[in-house]
């Protein structure tokens, strides 16, 4: 069965249906016509491509796979990002004249292997997606020499695996990318909370490892974890037991690793018993409008923070042209869709793919795109993120963090002391001492980088 295809049909539908909604008007038209994004010039543009140079590539099209658990989660973040970027890029002429087509690979949580087999058969590249159980498809991907620029990686088997370039932080790394954020939160913003930290996670093999990692990093930094508990991953009807446990342990700072809707139910229980930690790390997946709606009754006098880990926030649009342009693009191509943290992560992956592919001309190959991306030693996705050196492993680099706080007026930058634009950069992430697994390599499946064509 062919996947859902986003590309020519979307552009055609937009033209028929009065331009895909309102929004940026002339500015949108100019950005699409130029194919420039942020400070990157002409990443999408017309051309005279004539060859079928690689799997998934013809003289007219480039088929790219985007993984998503949408059949299970119903979250459209990666799909919306794919729709908006490909629509904008194709309106500018595509990739040297080739139409960019996003094949949505719905993994439905457990069907990663099946979708990867399909992607190996049909796609040129994987871009701007992710799956909770992504480790189930790594060996298939490497066996067919399929590179990826993911929006998000989850398991240790996949994080940093071969033929993968990811510039975003994830708890599945061998280092703690949130150690700078937590240091600021515990020692600077709320210094009285250091000896009373709680960790609450949704119960799954993945989040169990997350809990162990967070606890090790916090303990090494001098903080004391007084509460560490799991809750059923599907949530529960009554969160009073967890609220009372947090009160009994006098938790002053809570790190919540789970579904943001569940945090809303926990907050209701905390309010009912009259207890509230000084702060809650709601994790970056809560960076969306739905979270603000769920928490609207408690935003005035509660401290909910998230670390965007070097991804420029939406409230920086006046200072960061790439953010302003992204918002305009959504106004034009997906006016009813929310721009979430996962959308921002996906967009930087699409920009990386387009810029790298554009350098290859007519002879578009996987090797050319992958090697072009690896030459980016200060990658910012046109200004969407803090600089990252894609020629080196992410775990070997210093990091940036930037903190957003939920307020009645929306997500706003906290006073976290930025030193590089809208980011605070230069901290060295804590390296775990425990063995939490390693990424899969080409050698593990009997392949070599020299075989990439």
Residue ranges and their predicted role:
Residues 203, 211, 260-265, 311-376:
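Extracellular/periplasmic ligand-binding modules, especially the Venus flytrap/periplasmic-binding
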């Amino acid at each position: 069965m062919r996947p859902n295809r986003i590309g020519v049909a979307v552009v055609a539908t937009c033209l028929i249906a009065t331009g895909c909604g309102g929004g940026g008007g002339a500015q949108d038209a100019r950005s699409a016509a130029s194919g420039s994004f942020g400070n990157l010039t002409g990443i999408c543009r017309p051309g005279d491509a004539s060859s079928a140079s690689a799997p998934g590539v013809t003289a007219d099209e480039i088929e790219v796979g985007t993984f998503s658990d949408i059949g299970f989660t119903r979250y459209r973040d990666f799909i919306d990002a794919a729709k908006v970027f490909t629509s904008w890029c194709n309106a500018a002429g595509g990739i040297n004249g080739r139409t960019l087509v996003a094949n949505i690979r719905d993994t439905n949580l457990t069907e990663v292997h099946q979708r990867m087999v399909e992607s190996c058969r049909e796609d040129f590249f994987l871009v701007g997606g992710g799956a909770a159980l992504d480790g189930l498809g790594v060996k298939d991907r490497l066996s067919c020499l399929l590179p990826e620029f993911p929006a998000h990686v989850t398991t240790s088997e996949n994080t940093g695996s071969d033929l993968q370039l990811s510039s975003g932080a994830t708890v599945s790394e061998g280092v703690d990318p949130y150690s700078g954020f937590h240091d600021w939160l515990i020692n600077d913003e709320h210094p009285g909370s250091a000896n009373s930290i709680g960790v609450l996670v949704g119960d799954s093999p993945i989040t169990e490892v997350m809990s162990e990692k967070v606890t090790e990093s916090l303990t090494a930094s001098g903080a004391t974890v007084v509460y560490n508990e799991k809750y059923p991953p599907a949530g529960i009807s009554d969160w009073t037991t967890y609220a009372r446990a947090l009160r009994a342990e006098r938790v002053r700072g809570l790190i919540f690793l789970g579904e943001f809707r569940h945090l809303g139910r926990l907050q209701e229980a905390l309010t009912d018993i009259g207890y509230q930690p000084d702060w809650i790390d709601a994790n970056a997946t809560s960076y969306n409008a739905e979270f603000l709606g769920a928490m609207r009754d408690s935003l005035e006098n509660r401290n909910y923070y998230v670390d965007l880990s070097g991804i420029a926030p939406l409230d920086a649009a006046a200072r960061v042209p790439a953010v302003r342009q992204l918002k305009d693009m959504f106004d034009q191509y997906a006016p009813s869709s929310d721009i979430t943290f996962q959308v921002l992560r996906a967009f930087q992956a699409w920009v990386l793919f387009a810029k790298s592919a554009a350098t290859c001309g007519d002879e578009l190959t996987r090797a050319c795109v992958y090697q072009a991306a690896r030459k980016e030693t200060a990658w910012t996705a046109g200004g969407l993120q803090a600089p990252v050196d894609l020629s080196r492993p992410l775990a070997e680099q210093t990091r940036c963090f930037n903190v957003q706080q939920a307020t009645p007026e929306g997500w706003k930058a906290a006073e976290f002391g930025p030193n590089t634009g809208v980011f605070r950069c230069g901290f060295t992430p804590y390296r775990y001492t425990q063995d939490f697994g390693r990424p899969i390599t080409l050698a593990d499946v009997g392949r070599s980088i020299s075989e990439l064509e």
